[in-house]
């Protein structure tokens, strides 16, 4: 059971949420008094409480979602709060639904979406994974961070062929290496205020690091927001090549490192928005004509469940008509379907841009 001090903090946080009438987070929408009372004393076997789940959303009332999972068990123990939020965010993934088994599908179905190189600047596909037997960020000890990094770096050092590369720990990193990784846009920074409030940045930079292959087309982030972020990317529009590289890497790593998986929710991640396939396939794409007709752009995006962001990701502007466009759906469909939907949508956008 949660201790009295934790419950007192929770009561205070709940009052703050209640009073915040202009707060639009999913946390506020779904944390009713009944649900709050039924969950406030619960504690996972690793010691996580409802406070770990909601504290970021309580501190940052402008959160979109407002909750994180401190460990894998939290998704089950605090399901009365997680499930409706997951259903709301992953539109159509009902509380009775079950995420399908992993299926990367026929990788030959993916192509170069822009063979002339007119529209697509770069292509990237990533997924997140959590290592079985370890909690997520807020509950990790410094020793666990280091132990995980050791496992990850030794696993990655076994990669061969195109995936062969080097691991760079953030701890003790020289200024030169740091600058080089920043210039390549590889280095991740300490978390933003949402992650800070969720206690996702403790013992920084212990256990954090970056692996990349010699061609700089394959990247693994260790202990950033998730235990592992596996990323395949390159200039141009060859989605097929990018996807195939990611799939072979994930399959290879999976043989050596068991990942946390949930029967109903698929692969588990720290933030419920990334559950399921955890896959985000994206392009940086120049669409000057559609940029001038934002309504049409949004209409096509909605039809193919695409998310349109500014050039530098969430909450940024499209610089020079360049957008970051990705698949929106991660749950209730396979990896293949998620990326195929994105490919179809991008092909359609290019077709319309050409016709305008």
UniProtKB/Swiss-Prot annotation:
The EC number(s) this enzyme carries: 2.7.3.3
Domain of life: Eukaryota
Binding site for L-arginine: 64-68, 225, 271, 314
Gene Ontology, cellular component aspect: extracellular space
Residue stretches making up the Phosphagen kinase N-terminal domain: 9-91
CDD domains per UniProt: arginine_kinase_like
Pfam family, any one: ATP-gua_Ptrans
Class of the enzyme per the UniProt entry, highest EC level: transferase
Keyword Transport in record: no
Domain Phosphagen kinase C-terminal: 119-356
N-acetylalanine modifications at: 2
Keyword flag Kinase: yes
InterPro entries from the UniProt entry: ATP-guanido_PTrfase, ATP-guanido_PTrfase_AS, ATP-guanido_PTrfase_cat, ATP-guanido_PTrfase_N, ATP-guanido_PTrfase_N_sf, Gln_synth/guanido_kin_cat_dom
GO molecular function, one term: ATP binding
Record-stated family: Belongs to the ATP:guanido phosphotransferase family.
Protein name: Arginine kinase
Lineage: Eukaryota, Metazoa, Ecdysozoa, Arthropoda, Crustacea
């Amino acid at each position: 059971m949660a201790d009295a001090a934790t419950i007192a903090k929770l009561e205070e946080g709940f009052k703050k949420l209640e009073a915040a009438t202009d707060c639009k987070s999913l946390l506020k929408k779904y944390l009713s008094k009944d649900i709050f009372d039924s969950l406030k004393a619960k504690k996972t076997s690793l010691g996580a409480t409802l406070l770990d789940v909601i504290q970021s959303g309580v501190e940052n009332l402008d959160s979109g979602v407002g909750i994180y999972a401190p460990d894998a068990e939290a998704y089950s123990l605090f399901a009365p709060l997680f499930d409706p939020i997951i259903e709301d965010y992953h539109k159509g993934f009902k509380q009775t639904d079950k995420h399908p088994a992993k299926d990367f599908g026929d990788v030959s179905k993916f192509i170069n979406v822009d063979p002339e190189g007119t529209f697509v600047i770069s292509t990237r596909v990533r997924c997140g994974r959590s290592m079985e037997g370890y909690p997520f960020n807020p509950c990790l000890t410094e020793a666990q961070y280091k132990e995980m990094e050791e496992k990850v770096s030794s696993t990655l050092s076994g990669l061969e062929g195109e995936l062969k590369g080097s691991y760079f720990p953030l701890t003790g990193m020289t200024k030169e290496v740091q600058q080089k990784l920043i210039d390549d846009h590889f280095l991740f920074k300490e978390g933003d205020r949402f992650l800070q409030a969720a206690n996702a940045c403790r013992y920084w930079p212990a256990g954090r690091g970056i692996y990349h292959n010699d061609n700089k087309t394959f990247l693994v982030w260790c202990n950033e927001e998730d235990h592992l972020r596996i990323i395949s990317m390159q200039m141009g529009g060859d989605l097929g090549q990018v996807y195939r590289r990611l799939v072979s890497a994930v399959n290879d790593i999976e043989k050596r490192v068991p990942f946390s998986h949930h029967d109903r929710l698929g692969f588990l991640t720290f933030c419920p928005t990334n559950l399921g396939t955890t896959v985000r396939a994206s392009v940086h794409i120049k669409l000057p004509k559609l940029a001038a007709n934002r309504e049409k752009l949004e209409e096509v995006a909605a039809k193919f469940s695409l998310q349109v962001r500014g050039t530098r990701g969430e909450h940024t502007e499209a610089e020079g008509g360049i957008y970051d466009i990705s698949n929106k759906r991660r749950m209730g469909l396979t990896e293949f379907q998620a990326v195929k939907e994105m490919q179809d949508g991008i092909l359609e956008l290019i077709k319309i841009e050409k016709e305008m």
